[in-house]
Curated annotation (Swiss-Prot):
Residues involved in Mn(2+) 1 binding: D299, H382, E413, E437
Gene name per UniProt: pepP2
One GO cellular component, as annotated: cytosol
Reaction(s) catalysed (UniProt annotation): Release of any N-terminal amino acid, including proline, that is linked to proline, even from a dipeptide or tripeptide
Residues annotated for Mn(2+) 2 binding in this entry: D287, D299, E437
Class of the enzyme per the UniProt entry, highest EC level: hydrolase
GO biological process terms, semicolon-separated: proteolysis
Gene3D superfamilies: Creatinase/methionine aminopeptidase superfamily (3.90.230.10), Creatinase/prolidase N-terminal domain (3.40.350.10)
Domain of life: Bacteria
Keywords: Aminopeptidase, Hydrolase, Manganese, Metal-binding, Metalloprotease, Protease
Name of the protein this chain belongs to: Xaa-Pro aminopeptidase 2
Amino acid sequence: MSNRRKNSLYPTLSAELSALMRTGWADTERHDLAPAEQAPYAALRRAALSARFPGERLVVPSGNLKVRSNDDTYPFRSYSGYVHMTGDQARDGALVLEPRPDGGHDAYCYQLPRDSRDDDEFWTGAHAELWTGRRRSLAESERVLGLPCRDVRTAAADLAAVSEVRTRIVRGIDPALEAAVTTDEERDAELEDALSDLRLVKDAWELGELRKAVDSTVRGFTDVVGELSRAVASSERWLEGTFFRRARLEGNAVGYGTICAAGEHATIMHWTDNDGPVRPGDLLLLDAGVETRSLYTADVTRTLPISGTFTPLQREVYDAVYEAQEAGIATVKPGAAYRDFHEAAQRHLAARLVEWGFIEGPAERAYELGLQRRFTMAGTGHMLGLDVHDCARARTEEYVEGVLEPGMCLTVEPGLYFQADDLTVPEEWRGIGVRIEDDLVVTEDGHENLSAGLPRSADEVEAWMARFAG
């Protein structure tokens, strides 16, 4: 046979080699696999989703590989709604909730099965197991997920064959599955909204994963402090790499693009180039989070004096942000409006900016007009979980306009950013950026700061750096 590949050093495949490759392989089926730790929690989440859409078929894909360049792909990351509902992270999968005539749904999962040794695909395919690693068999997946599993290669035909069932699918994740079903865009959006709604309150297992993520992140920040002196001779990249090493060692990776911003880069909200110099006397704003192997992420920010101590002006700005964060954190408790922490922090920053003469007062009027936003830029926090900006599609009345409940996890992250080219502030203020961010869980009687292991006040930061700086 001939199987020509452009510019391959092996442009042909002989029948003899093909026959040789198909024989002599051991049976590696694993019969010792137990259900995943999160499987019973995922079953409860599916039941909650089922209750929202009686009589309708629901399709939640995991997603496909995305090309980085040529034949190189990005590391795969499953759609968070799929992970939440299944505990699975495999590519090319899909959860289907099939409505039962008597109510409720039957759940099953489409998976990409193992490559057969009866043809050449297992070693010649673009993503063949012999090249990229062993996948789980369908039987293995059933044992791990606690769900019936089917071959995803028949999914499009299966779904298209039962076209009379009213169906919703999460759009933009798997084009082939999306093309196989006839759905309504507005109704599909409601499914995605519901998947976000159901992540607003974390269960006990999720909170445990978030604690792991934050604890690893605390260790990663300590690693960075120990490498500051080396980074002065290199760049922000050295510190980004230092944190990434911890993330890979203890978790899956980083949960989002690390912001490692020294000097005036600290005034750029989402600086991820991380290629600038690290200079003594400047501040380093590090916004980073470890993502666990279950894909839950931390999101923590500290602003550090590279020399180990704040200058008087740096400390003045830092203290203003710290006090604003304290005001925001104090509001986090069950029954409080979600917006309370944001409003408390922003009111404090507006008052300080009026006091400094950078915006026109009185402070309450400045806040009501949003004048502080020239220097605060973003909102003061967000939900946290499988995504760094978790529950982004949740209904507004349940999220931003909702009230806090035990089990919710959110960040509180006020900041002040005086751009290097901002002529409305004195020259010595320009290029100073400060943000402090912590991860909080709402408890029955208040809140728990998961990231309390990292110092926050200026004095605490300086003492911590003196202890760990290399």
